[in-house]
């Protein structure tokens, strides 16, 4: 007889190989066809709401690995929240306005298109990009409302954004002023703080002499009767700002020295600089000298010095006063700072504090980076081309003390990678320290209080955002662009004042934009709204900062705190969001702008929690770079290994820091995936012939080890759900892997194989095991589903078509409409766990000893062994309680327990009996049945009799 055929060998249509890259697109298509997202919404209706608001990626270019990380993390959270019993929608969004798209239109069609044409082409381009990105996001297994995303360029969104502008204007936060702002010559526009990055750059560093003018006043400041001719010396890395100099700054508490030097410089024998900087400066200039007098910086306030180019051109024949500044340091330079208020924030603040009018500020640099033609000596030159010319002019005027090359970290545009300057222009601002009209706290105060009330994951994000808000300048709202939401103001042509009915007019404009998009503002004739007043006003041409676009989506998409705005998705979502989740750069981006708009509109943040993930680097910790050749595209991984591998990589990596990825790392992830898949295959194969409705064993009648397995599963489930709740995904993955490999594979399933395969197919022993396995399988699949979505869905379909087929709510469309599995409580759960924890420890000792005996060649498999265990009272009771089932737990042919006062002692010997050809146990009763001499007594009983007596394992 072929006894192999008498075994209950496992069988399942769930294949060993996932073939993920080939099969996943089919699941994506099926989810689309069967409207899985809509099914989730229907199943979740009426539950507590959980809102993750999607930070919109920019609608330009293909998605990269960072996008994949971001979307997968969001998908894990939304799916896990739905399965935890929440109603968690996912409405994806896209950021659609702004410079990068304008650049693409310029590249394709040239720079001089009419504004309306730029806008229509930009809108069409953004839609094309969204379609490309949407396809790639869906390929990652991300479920969401892909047919109805929010777009910042939707007419309704553009209109509501104008309404948001009206509300913060009405509250008193918005003002117009001349201030130095980050300016990109290539953009031709102001930049937000988040649009500035730093890179090393080499610039000329120069020491420049400003000649004395009123030598009598200077002598008195130093307590002298008189002084010779000379100059005060400054140090700067921006020679191009020298033509715009309007003041000098010294620190009030620093000691300054008059130094008589030789050989005598052009402007005279005396030089004025900080005492502490005299020695290194003279050495650098090749001079010798002695200090003739010192004075505190405060004594120099108000003294005036001649412009260093006064001798070179009449246009520079002016003097600059000394102002006091606490920001002056002695780290480098001379301890004297030159001030060009149009091109430096501290310079601007200092000069304004001393009464300099906006109209008197010198700003010869135009928006394209060139000096105005009227500027003496350098008119028409770009500031960078002018640098060497200015240095040469200073040298000819006798005002150049030293020029050196300096490599330093400098501001650059994040789009063009070109240098950015501070440039004073007339812009619209949201005031950080302005008190709103209702008398409440300033924007800075309410934002800082809001940070304190927000949960941060990881916790260090709080200090980072707090420091940014505490130190940031006013928010420059305006941009000089074409493809953006207009700051739809009417400005008086003579006074520059806003129309007195501006808030009302903004609503009228918003109504038109709602029907025709921002193009409606472009084509609007002011007479339509202003009537006869139209001649007095002009349309403001500025657009809103794109960070205002995305930063106000909590109002335009979620509906805001008061629901006054229409909002595109207010019915599905809610304000405030439970969570915003983005990369760590968004502390200065979307997190930041959303916080400010939320606090201006409603007095507190639009989110309860902020989750930050790090950037992706290669296996050596280097940034992804095409030039280095270490870029890993998510599309390529999906097409070769499968998106499931990307999902598992994201979930198993600590996202709070940098996420490392390489071919080698992905190879290890593939191995982890295979182990999980093999566990699932075993589980599915062993419940394939099981009917959950008609064949389940009551929980109270389960074998002891089966009850322990369920208690163990419940403990694991609680831990994993806790990790999901706290957004700790890599410990969740680790726990699931440990459960599959150690708790199941190396322990429970290893022991269970004998009972599953050798007992009668319909026996209580086998059905007890299958009852437990079905609960374990359901628990495991539902816990895995947020991460391994394709695999969990595939396995769920197999399970729904077999063991669960006869349940009342079958067939189930998808695993994603399920909630986490409800496992039975066991009154003796703690006692069971304590007992079996000790049994597992003893089993591990036995296995170690068995391996020693096997290595010595005394036995082949562990089933050839017979074990005697000598145990103290406590261990003896535990081991003896299993009776003959102990041998199945230890996977040996005989296990005998002996009482002993000492600690555990294990003796192992090879069995002297014959091997059963069916169960492979070596038993004394093999051959005793004349009809079946090849098998043992229990196999005879299982095949032809009442079945073996067995209750523990």
From Swiss-Prot:
Protein name in UniProt: Isoleucine--tRNA ligase
GO biological process terms held by the UniProt record: isoleucyl-tRNA aminoacylation
Keywords of the record: Aminoacyl-tRNA synthetase, ATP-binding, Cytoplasm, Ligase, Metal-binding, Nucleotide-binding, Protein biosynthesis, Zinc
Record-listed E.C. numbers: 6.1.1.5
Essential cofactor(s): Zn(2+)
Annotated family: Belongs to the class-I aminoacyl-tRNA synthetase family. IleS type 1 subfamily.
Gene this protein is translated from: ileS
Task of the protein: Catalyzes the attachment of isoleucine to tRNA(Ile). As IleRS can inadvertently accommodate and process structurally similar amino acids such as valine, to avoid such errors it has two additional distinct tRNA(Ile)-dependent editing activities. One activity is designated as 'pretransfer' editing and involves the hydrolysis of activated Val-AMP. The other activity is designated 'posttransfer' editing and involves deacylation of mischarged Val-tRNA(Ile).
Highest taxon in the source lineage: Bacteria
Motif residue range(s): 'HIGH' region: 57-67
Organism placement in taxonomy: Bacteria, Pseudomonadati, Pseudomonadota, Betaproteobacteria, Burkholderiales
Gene Ontology cellular component annotations, sorted alphabetically: cytosol
């Amino acid at each position: 007889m072929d006894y192999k055929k008498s075994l209950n060998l496992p069988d399942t249509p769930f294949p060993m190989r996932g073939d993920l890259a080939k099969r996943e697109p089919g699941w994506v298509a099926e989810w689309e066809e069967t409207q899985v997202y809509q099914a989730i919404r229907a199943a979740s209706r009426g539950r507590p709401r959980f809102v993750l608001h999607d930070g919109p990626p920019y609608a330009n270019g293909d998605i990269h690995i960072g996008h994949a990380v971001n979307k997968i993390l969001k998908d894990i959270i939304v799916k896990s929240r739905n399965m935890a019993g929440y109603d968690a929608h996912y409405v994806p969004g896209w950021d659609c306005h702004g410079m990068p798209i304008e650049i693409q239109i310029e590249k394709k069609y040239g720079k001089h298109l009419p504004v309306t044409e730029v806008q229509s082409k930009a809108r069409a381009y953004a839609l094309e990009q969204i379609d490309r990105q949407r396809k790639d996001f869906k390929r990652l297994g991300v479920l969401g409302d892909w047919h109805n995303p929010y777009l910042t360029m939707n007419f309704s969104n553009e209109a509501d954004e104008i309404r948001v502008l009206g509300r913060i204007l009405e509250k008193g936060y918005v003002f117009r002023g001349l201030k130095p702002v980050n300016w990109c010559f290539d953009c031709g526009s102001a930049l937000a703080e988040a649009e500035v990055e730093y890179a090393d750059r080499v610039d000329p560093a120069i020491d420049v002499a400003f000649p004395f003018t009123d030598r009598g006043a200077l002598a008195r400041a130093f307590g002298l009767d008189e002084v010779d001719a000379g100059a005060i010396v400054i140090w700067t890395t921006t020679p191009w700002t020298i033509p715009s100099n309007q003041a000098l700054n010294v620190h009030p508490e620093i000691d300054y020295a008059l130094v008589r030097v030789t050989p005598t410089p052009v402007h005279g024998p005396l030089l004025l600089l900080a005492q502490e900087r005299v020695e290194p400066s003279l050495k650098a200039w090749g001079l010798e000298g002695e200090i003739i007098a010192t004075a505190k910086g405060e004594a120099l306030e108000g003294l005036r010095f001649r412009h260093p180019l006064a001798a070179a051109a009449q246009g520079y024949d002016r003097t600059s006063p000394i102002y006091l500044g606490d920001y002056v340091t002695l780290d480098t330079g001379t301890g004297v700072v030159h001030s060009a208020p149009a091109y430096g924030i501290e310079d601007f603040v200092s000069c304004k504090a001393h009464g300099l009018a906006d109209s008197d500020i010198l700003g010869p640099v135009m928006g394209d980076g060139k000096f105005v033609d009227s500027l003496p000596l350098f008119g028409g030159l770009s500031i960078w081309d002018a640098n060497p010319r200015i240095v040469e002019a200073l040298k000819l005027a006798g005002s150049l003390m030293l020029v050196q090359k300096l490599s330093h970290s400098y501001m650059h545009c994040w789009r063009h990678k070109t240098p950015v300057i501070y440039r004073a222009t007339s812009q619209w601002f949201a005031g950080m320290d302005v008190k709103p009209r209702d008398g409440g706290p300033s924007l800075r105060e309410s934002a800082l209080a809001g940070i304190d009330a927000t949960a941060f994951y990881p916790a260090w994000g709080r200090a980072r955002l707090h420091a940014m808000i505490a130190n940031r300048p006013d928010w420059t709202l305006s941009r000089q662009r074409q493809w953006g939401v207009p700051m739809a103001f009417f400005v008086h042509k003579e006074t520059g004042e806003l129309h007195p009915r501006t808030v009302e007019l903004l609503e009228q404009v918003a109504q038109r934009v709602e029907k025709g998009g921002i193009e409606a503002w472009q084509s609007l004739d002011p007479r339509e709204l202003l009537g006869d007043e139209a001649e007095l006003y002009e349309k403001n041409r500025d657009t809103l900062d794109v960070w205002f676009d995305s930063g106000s989506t909590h109002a335009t998409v979620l509906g805001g705190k008061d629901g006054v705005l229409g909002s595109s998705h207010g019915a599905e979502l809610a304000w405030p969001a439970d969570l915003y989740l983005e990369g760590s750069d968004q502390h200065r981006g979307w997190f930041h702008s959303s916080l400010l708009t939320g606090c201006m509109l409603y007095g507190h943040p639009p989110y309860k929690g902020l989750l930050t993930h790090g950037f992706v680097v290669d296996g050596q910790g280097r940034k992804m770079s095409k030039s280095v050749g270490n870029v890993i595209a998510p599309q390529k991984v999906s097409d070769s290994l499968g998106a499931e591998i990307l999902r598992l990589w994201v979930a198993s990596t600590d996202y709070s820091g940098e996420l490392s990825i390489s071919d080698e790392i992905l190879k290890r992830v593939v191995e982890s995936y295979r182990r999980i898949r093999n566990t699932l295959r075993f589980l599915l194969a062993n419940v394939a012939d099981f009917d959950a409705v008609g064949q389940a064993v009551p929980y109270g009648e389960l074998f002891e080890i089966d009850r322990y397995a369920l208690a163990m599963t419940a403990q694991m489930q609680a831990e994993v759900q806790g990790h999901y709740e706290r957004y700790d995904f890599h410990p969740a993955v680790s726990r699931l892997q440990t459960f599959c490999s150690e708790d199941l594979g190396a322990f429970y399933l290893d022991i269970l194989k004998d009972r599953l395969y050798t007992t009668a197919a319909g026996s209580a022993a086998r059905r007890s095991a299958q009852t437990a396995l079905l609960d374990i399988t359901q628990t495991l699949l539902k816990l895995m589903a947020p991460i391994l979505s394709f695999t969990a869905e595939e396995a769920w379909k197999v399970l729904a078509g077999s063991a669960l087929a006869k349940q009342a709510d079958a067939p189930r469309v998808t695993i994603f409409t399920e909630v986490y599995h409800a496992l039975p409580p066991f009154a003796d759960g703690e006692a069971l766990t304590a007992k079996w924890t000790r049994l597992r420890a003893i089993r591990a000792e036995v296995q170690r000893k068995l391996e020693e005996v096997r290595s010595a060649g005394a036995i082949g498999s562990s089933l050839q062994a017979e074990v005697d265990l000598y145990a103290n009272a406590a261990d003896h009771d535990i081991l003896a309680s299993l009776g003959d089932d102990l041998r199945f737990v230890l996977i040996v042919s005989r296990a005998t327990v002996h009482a002993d006062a000492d600690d555990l002692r294990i003796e192992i010997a090879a069995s002297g009996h014959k091997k059963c050809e069916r169960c492979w146990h070596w038993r004394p009763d093999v051959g005793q049945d004349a009809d079946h001499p090849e098998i043992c007594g229990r196999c005879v009983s299982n095949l032809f009799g009442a079945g073996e007596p067995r209750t523990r394992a």
